[in-house]
């Protein structure tokens, strides 16, 4: 990903008349890292659970589609697979951000405890809505090559194949093109020839299409750009991006200060010290990894704190982990609440070094906002279970079985009432998803 693509996020604020709807229905994964059999995270809301502000109507053309959840919180013991779920959701987007044709390995990693699965492809399935149309994308891949790539769409609720690509060691790679796929036989064949074994056909088709061929661009844009996944190390990158944006925009700097002060972080001033090396080497097309290194080494961020005794200035590196993480979460927060689009933000360990009341406020503000964006996060903070902010179907749990395989399930799968003390019942083991501890 290049710096320019990160800075482009602000372009959404310049065009409020444009509205792009991007919504996740459900995501499934199998034979990937700690996932053995198919596990599904669903954002489809269960009926009759109340809390209308927690759900929204997805507006699918020609379909009376059920409501979707605005928020999903994922709990579970350490090493139970929460972070692996975030990695799985991010894999397709990560693959689309790689330059087609590069000799890269696909970040697929099979379930290693089952010898029969080690040489088989990891499988991913994602159902989503983009610009009023429902899509289903299926990917089966090893680290070396793609074994299946299939895309369906559902005009007026009816399943239609756009294309399917399948490979097996015993046969040549086979492509099937749906009758409604635009372009024609000659164009389809050209796309096929341009697609190497380790790249997505979808990417090649879009990147090698003329302006009048837009049918595949919609699902391509959703899969590439509508999911913002933030892993445990990714928050640092977004913190760097936040600081880079402030360097270029006083309005941005003021907005971040307001965001932090709203969360009771007493920062009243932000300034930057850029070295000559930084000014000479950085450019809009710089790769984000190079940019991160330059910002960390050649651009110092100074933060002013104000108390009753006066002001004091601190370097960014002197700030607490929580303050640094909040600065990193700020861009995803803008991503969630941009006026011109709805997005899906997935955060691993949202509560990392952040006070539970701040997490509660962030979740509450997202729920009451008139938006169809979705926030999915992993956490160990059970305080949210006791706030009555979320419904039973918004709490998800992970745990590993005796074979080391991750299971994913919702608290709503267990009998209970909306008025029950979810946190208390969770610690009593009523829903599982707890660490099994032994006293030494």
Model-derived regions, located:
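Switch/communication elements of ASCE P-loop NTPase nucleotide-binding domains
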Residues: 2-93, 306-439
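Conserved P-loop NTP-binding catalytic core
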Residues: 20, 57-73, 77, 86-146
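Extended helical coiled-coil dimerization/tether regions that scaffold
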Residues: 22, 30, 236-318, 437-440
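Short polybasic amphipathic segments
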Residues: 27, 124-126, 146-153, 299-307, ...
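Glycine-centered tight beta-turn/hairpin loop motif at sheet-sheet or coil-to-beta transitions
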Residues: 34, 130-134, 156, 308-311
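Coil-to-beta-strand transition motifs
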Residues: 36, 119-121, 132-134, 143-147, ...
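Short, surface-exposed charged micro-motifs
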Residues: 40, 125, 136-140, 291, ...
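Electropositive, glycine-dotted interaction segments
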Residues: 136-279
């Amino acid at each position: 990903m290049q710096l320019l693509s990160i800075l482009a996020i602000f372009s959404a604020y310049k065009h409020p008349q444009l509205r792009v709807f991007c919504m996740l229905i459900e995501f499934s994964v199998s034979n990937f890292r700690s996932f053995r059999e198919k596990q599904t995270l669903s954002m489809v809301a269960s009926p009759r659970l109340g809390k209308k502000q927690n759900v929204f109507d997805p507006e699918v053309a020609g379909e009376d589609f059920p409501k979707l959840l605005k928020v999903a919180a994922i709990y579970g013991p350490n090493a139970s697979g929460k972070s692996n779920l975030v990695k799985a959701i991010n894999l397709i987007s990560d693959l689309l951000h790689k330059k087609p044709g590069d000799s890269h390995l696909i970040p697929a990693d099979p379930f290693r405890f089952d010898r029969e699965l080690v040489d088989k492809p990891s499988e991913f399935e994602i159902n989503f809505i983009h610009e009023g149309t429902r899509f289903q994308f299926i990917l089966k891949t090893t680290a070396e090559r793609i074994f299946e790539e299939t895309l369906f769409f559902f005009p007026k609720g009816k399943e239609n194949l756009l294309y399917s690509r399948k490979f097996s060691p015993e046969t040549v790679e086979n492509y099937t093109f749906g009758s409604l796929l635009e372009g024609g036989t000659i164009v389809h064949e050209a796309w096929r020839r341009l697609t190497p074994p380790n790249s997505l056909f979808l990417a090649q088709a879009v990147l090698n299409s003329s302006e009048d061929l837009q049918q595949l661009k919609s699902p391509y844009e959703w899969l590439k750009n509508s999911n913002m996944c933030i892993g445990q190390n990714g928050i640092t990158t977004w913190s760097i991006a936040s600081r880079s944006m402030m360097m270029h925009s006083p309005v941005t700097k003021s907005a971040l200060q307001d965001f932090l002060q709203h969360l009771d972080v007493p920062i009243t001033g932000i300034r930057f010290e850029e070295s000559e090396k930084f000014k000479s080497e950085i450019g809009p097309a710089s790769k984000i990894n190079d940019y991160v290194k330059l910002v960390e080494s050649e651009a110092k961020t100074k933060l002013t704190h104000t108390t009753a005794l006066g002001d004091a200035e601190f370097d960014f590196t002197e700030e607490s982990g929580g303050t640094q993480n909040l600065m990193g979460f700020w861009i995803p927060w803008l991503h969630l609440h941009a006026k011109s689009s709805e997005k899906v933000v997935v955060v691993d360990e949202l509560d990392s070094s952040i006070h539970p009341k701040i997490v509660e406020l962030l979740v509450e503000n997202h729920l009451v906002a008139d938006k169809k964006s979705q926030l999915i996060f992993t956490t160990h903070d059970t305080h949210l279970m006791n706030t009555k902010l979320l419904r039973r179907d918004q709490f998800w749990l992970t745990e590993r079985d005796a074979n080391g395989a991750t299971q994913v399930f919702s608290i709503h799968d267990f009998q209970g009432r909306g008025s029950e003390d979810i946190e208390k019942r969770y610690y009593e083991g009523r829903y599982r998803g707890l660490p099994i501890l032994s006293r030494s």
